[in-house]
Amino acid sequence: MDSQKKDPLYKSFGYAFEGIGTCIKKERNMKIHCAAAILVVIAGVILKISSLEWCICLTLFGLIMALELVNTAVEAVVDLVTEERKPLAKIAKDTAAGAV
């Protein structure tokens, strides 16, 4: 059995939102994605897109934001492991960036 006490669910959500906030504050590409999402929402309101189109937009926003968060996490872990320029570190970072 696991003897460590787990944090309450609300704390887990707090950690998640803290991570998202940090990514938005510190990562240029996340700021670009957020700005693009805002522009798409404005365009969607002006163009009166359908419910299906809103669902598609929201799904894509979520996927892009999630992949950017994963990319940021991969880059942070690689930087934590090594500050040196290594071929495998480059592959890990480039592949994570390519996922976005």
Q: How should these model regions be labeled?
A:
Residues 40-70:
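Membrane-embedded alpha-helical segments that form the functional core of polytopic membrane enzymes
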Residues 6, 10, 60, 86-89:
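Short, structured helix-loop boundary elements
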Residues 26, 47-51, 83:
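Short helix-capping/hinge motifs at transmembrane helix termini and TM-loop junctions
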Residues 1-5:
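Short, contiguous pre-domain boundary segments
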Residues 10, 14, 31-36, 52-59:
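Alpha-helical transmembrane segments of integral membrane proteins
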Residues 6, 13-31, 96, 100:
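Membrane interfacial helix-start motif at the N-side
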Residues 18, 36-43:
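Hydrophobic, membrane-inserted alpha-helices
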Residues 63-99:
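Acidic (Asp/Glu-rich) catalytic motifs at the cytosolic membrane interface
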